[in-house]
Amino acid sequence: MLGSMARKKPRNTSRLPLALNPLKSKDVLAVLAERNEAIVPVGAWVEPASPGSSEIPAYTSAYLIEEELKEQLRKKQEALKHFQKQVKYRVNQQIRLRKKQQLQKSYERAQKEGSIAMQSSATHLTSKRTSVFPNNLNVAIGSSRLPPSLMPGDGIEDEENQNELFQQQAQALSETMKQARHRLASFKTVIKKKGSVFPDDGRKSFLTREEVLSRKPASTGINTGIRGELPIKVHQGLLAAVPYQNYMENQELDYEEPDYEESSSLVTDEKGKEDLFGRGQQDQQAIHSEDKNKPFSRVQKVKFKNPLFVLMEEEEQKQLHFEGLQDILPEAQDYFLEAQGDLLETQGDLTGIQSVKPDTQAVEMKVQVTEPEGQAIEPEGQPIKTETQGIMLKAQSIELEEGSIVLKTQDFLPTNQALLTKNQDVLLKDHCVLPKDQSILLKYQDQDFLPRDQHVLHKDQDILPKYQDQNFLPKDQNFLSRDQHVLPKDQDILPKYQDQNFLPKDQNFLSRDQHVLPKDQNILPKYQGQDFLPKDQDFLSRDQHVLPKDWNILPKCQDQDFLPRDQGVLPKDQNILPICQDQDFLPRDQGYLPKDQNILPICQDRDFLPRDLHVLSNDQNILPKCQDQDFLPKYQKVHFKEPYSDMTDEKGREDFSLADYQCLPPKSQDQDDIKNQQPASFMREERVREELPLDYHQYVVPKIQDQDSPREQNKHIKLPSSFEKWEIARGNTPGVPLAYDRYQSGLSTEFQAPLAFQSDVDKEEDKKERQKQYLRHRRLFMDIEREQVKEQQRQKEQKKKIEKIKKKREQECYAAEQRILRMNFHEDPYSGEKLSEILAQLQLQEIKGTREKQQREKEYLRYVEALRAQIQEKMQLYNITLPPLCCCGPDFWDAHPDTCANNCIFYKNHRAYTRALHSFINSCDVPGGNSTLRVAIHNFASAHRRTLKNL
């Protein structure tokens, strides 16, 4: 590298010829001479010189030329040797640099490993101010100066010696590292309660593990991350070693000195480690002065006096510990100042790292922000709180206010709703309310234990659950649980239902899981959502039948859960009013009503009857009112179903008239029940068709399997045609049942909206179908067009082949005719030869003409392409954009007879392309200033026309 720097050429060199430039080396001239082969004179003509002439003889000039050639060859060899020597020198220099880098890396790695090792003496601990190997300090660390290989001006011979020195140092470091590791591995712990004898014959007691952990101070180690960023030579000056972490943990367990706190101190003692924080200020100042006076590369050894570890108490030790930490801080600062001084000394010798400045100001001291860990650590012997004390139940966090308890349903209750009393407890859902002297067993779903003071309740206890999802309590009504028994007679229950409104005010009402109330009990439910039952109408449950008053009633609970399992038969004088929260009208499985019962349903929300309707008696007054809606409510299906035979016999079924099939109680089911009952409905439809006459089978609507919405229901409803409506209106339609005649007036107006909606749906479907059909036809015609184009191309090729064959045969026939004519008319023997010559000339002329024609075509094509390129450039120059001629490409120039698609009008149709070009050129308006562009466009069109004529 130094040689290359010395060989730099001056910048401002005058440009001279190679032979006259004195700065050009002879090596370069030799290389240039090598390129030009030497011309050796062979067979030179030599003439004797005239005796009076002063010219050099010929043999003398030949000798001079030979000597000059030899000199050139010698210079060439010297230049080659010099070049090889330089290459070898540079290669060796690169190899030496790589070896140095590897040695430096290994030395740095060994020094890092040595910084965490212990001293060679087993009784001494390694401090931060001491070297790892004090006995082999000069060998391990080496000279603070740089190796001679890095010094400027040194020779190559010293580099090999320096490499050997580096290898010896690395080997010594590895050996000492192995010794330190063996000593660390062979270090054994001291038995508990056994004192260790130090060189000063002083016994020191050992602490227990708890005391050591409680008194373990923060390490005063210096942030070593910045040391890792410094160069390798700076590390040679920094001799502080970080203690090995596991080794120091073992020291906590083994050396149980009261005042010995584990810290990476900056001084060592050969005779023993005494208390760092118990010594006096004078000793500390003496140590500081000694540390400042001693050179940094030496090992500092200090003996401590007057240890105070025997008389110190717990609080004094903590105080002295903090004072010791504060004293270490200036000592560490002095340490870094000395390290900085050594670094400045070594900077003068460094060549590769001349700009390195250690950033000692960024080193953070852990001592400033560290607190003793012993204050924050509790001894293991302290009793630990049990887990049950730490568990806080959600029920315990509820604060009872005097006079009232806020429930989640408070916003939905009436204003005069009575809240719980003071002595009542708030329980979770599905729990019971007990008196004061009874225990409570809460039901925790996610816990496996119960509170301490709670027990299991008995069945006969009163339960007051907290219902979060209901708000149907009346003003003066208390909560009833799901499985609560019958309330007394004088109790007034007025539930409030938000989702239903189809029971009158004076209707009796029974909750889901309650028994039947007696006759004199007044139950007044309040329904808000629906109003299609009369005031004096009783409400029937889903699975109950209507019987005369003197019958006993046992409800059938198949699909509901509002009656308990153990409910018995009620007496005659009781009214039955179950709660039907999930229904909008009368449930399924409903029996027919007796004759004396008057039912007047108000069917405002439907326009025809649902399925599963039972038969009513003939004398029953039925006046449906279908005014407001156009389609069925949700989950409603329409078909007729035969009545159950629970309360009627086959004889009664035969007496039912067809007119009774028209108006039956509606039914609402959940979607799951509808899916489960689909197979049974098909059987019912078949039975209904068998029982009805053939004329009425058209009015039995089949069940729709996938019935998701009322819109889909309306699609499958069989409606009468306009003619049938007209006949029904006139009353002349035979075979139409009376029920349909009764509802004809309502259906004529109510089905208009569904029919309009159905027509819109049909229009959309027809439109989609027409679009699909159009796409199919389009695909078909495109395929047909492609096939036609291919067929036309095949026909053209076939015609060309046929024409060639015809032309060849015609020529052969013409030649045969000419031969016959010559044989008949020309008897001259030389006439045949003349004719053959003439034919040969004609053939040559034809061949020549075809070649010329092909050449002209090529020239025309080249000319056209050149014109095309010229026009494109000029149009881009004048920012002229042209629209495309066809759909084969987005640009005007994409249209070409040779590149267009086979279904394009210009495909192999030069005549059409030329015609389109001419029409376009005549129609386009070229600016007046662009005369060259106008001329180029016209030339392009005329060239295409000539090409077309030649073709």
Curated annotation (Swiss-Prot):
PANTHER family (UniProt xref): COILED-COIL DOMAIN-CONTAINING PROTEIN 15
Presence of keyword Ligase: no
Main location: cytoplasm
Subcellular location: Cytoplasm, Cytoskeleton, Microtubule organizing center, Centrosome; Cytoplasm, Cytoskeleton, Microtubule organizing center, Centrosome, Centriole; Cytoplasm, Cytoskeleton, Microtubule organizing center, Centrosome, Centriolar satellite
Subunit structure: Interacts with POC5, POC1B, CETN2 and FAM161A.
Keywords for the protein's UniProt record, in alphabetical order: Cilium biogenesis/degradation, Coiled coil, Cytoplasm, Cytoskeleton
Coiled coil location: 64-89, 154-193, 782-813, 839-874
GO biological process terms held by the UniProt record: cilium assembly; positive regulation of centriole elongation
Record's protein name: Coiled-coil domain-containing protein 15
GO CC terms: centriolar satellite; centriole; centrosome; cytoplasm
Tree of life domain: Eukaryota
Its biological purpose: Plays an important role in primary cilium assembly, maintenance, and length regulation. Interacts with centriole inner scaffold proteins to promote proper centriole size and integrity and assembly of functional cilia. Required for the recruitment of both the inner scaffold protein POC1B and the distal SFI1/CETN2 complex to centrioles.
Gene: CCDC15
